Amino acid sequence: MKVAVLGAAGGIGQALALLLKTQLPSGSELSLYDIAPVTPGVAVDLSHIPTAVKIKGYSGEDAKPALAGADIVLISAGVARKPGMDRSDLFNVNAGIVRNLVEQIAITCPKACIGIITNPVNTTVAIAAEVLKKAGVYDKNKLFGVTTLDIIRSNTFVAELKGKQPQDINVPVIGGHSGVTILPLLSQVSGISFSEQEVADLTKRIQNAGTEVVEAKAGGGSATLSMGQAAARFGLSLVRALQGENGVVECAYVESDGKHARFFAQPILLGKDGVAERKDIGTLSAFEQNALSSMLDTLKQDIELGETFIK
């Protein structure tokens, strides 16, 4: 199993690479790529950690040597949010970066599963899909927007509020991966009930959690460490599913049946070929139904922005 991390010298990429080096199954290969010249050194640094994961770093304009033979590619390359920016302000820079990297994936490892971390995810996933489609290699079951950070935040915040163990909480989060498009389905958390005020407050906190980190870091960065952990969780789940483990379910932003929007975050069953099943989002509360209806225009606009960027 070979996993490639693109953008591996950045804050998310380094955290993700560290977690993968320590947690990938023995015998796995980890390939690190970034435009920054430090990247081979990041790989050397990580290579001293005593786990049976082979690691190599690549830098420069050409990602193809890093991508050769990859089963999974995780893309965290791009610029990070600064105070006062929202995820869509990142579009102008990050759209081109994602396009360039996915064009190289289409040539080098077209059958790989691709996890997009680079924001704005609502839009960058649509860009990736259109690039792959243009190259004639698009498989909607192998392209994912990594929204796992919304899930781990939801689990953490619910556990804090209710005095529970976070590992015992599982909040499904649907929709997209920015602002109002992030919709935690708190009504589906088993064994816990919330007041209307708690639901409103938690939903808002989960939607704005990225901004909470950006502001707390006072211009020194965005959510890199928690995002690294979230991306590692998703990547490791994908590894387990590709290796034949049954019953691996994660929420992710994938091309859906189009009922809500072309791309939609929902619980998915992972399998040997990527998405095995898009699971039903279940019954929503009135609050959730209303939030879903009112976010769809925003989500569809985000998607269209990505589609037109390529077309």
Swiss-Prot record:
Q: Which UniProt keywords apply?
A: NAD, Oxidoreductase, Tricarboxylic acid cycle
Residues recorded as binding substrate, renumbered to this chain, are: R81, R87, N119, R153
Class of enzymatic activity (EC top level): oxidoreductase
One Gene Ontology term from the biological process aspect of the record: tricarboxylic acid cycle
Keyword Cell inner membrane found: no
Q: What is its EC number?
A: 1.1.1.37
Annotated NAD(+) binding sites: G7, A8, A9, G10, G11, I12, G13, D34, N94, I117, T118, N119, M227
Reactions listed under catalytic activity: (S)-malate + NAD(+) = oxaloacetate + NADH + H(+)
Q: Name one GO cellular component term.
A: cytoplasm
MF annotations from Gene Ontology: L-malate dehydrogenase (NAD+) activity
Q: What positions constitute the catalytic site?
A: H177 (proton acceptor)
Tell me the SUPFAM superfamilies matching this sequence: LDH C-terminal domain-like, NAD(P)-binding Rossmann-fold domains
Task: Tell me which Pfam families the record gives.
Answer: Ldh_1_C, Ldh_1_N
Q: Which InterPro entries match?
A: L-lactate/malate_DH, Lactate/malate_DH_C, Lactate/malate_DH_N, Lactate_DH/Glyco_Ohase_4_C, Malate_DH_AS, Malate_DH_type1, Malate_DH_type1_bac, NAD(P)-bd_dom_sf
Family statement drawn from the similarity comment of this UniProt entry: Belongs to the LDH/MDH superfamily. MDH type 1 family.
Q: What does this protein do?
A: Catalyzes the reversible oxidation of malate to oxaloacetate.
Which protein, by its recorded name, is this?
Malate dehydrogenase
Instruction: Name the species this protein comes from.
Output: Pectobacterium atrosepticum (strain SCRI 1043 / ATCC BAA-672)
Q: Lineage of this protein's species?
A: Bacteria, Pseudomonadati, Pseudomonadota, Gammaproteobacteria, Enterobacterales
Supply the gene name: mdh
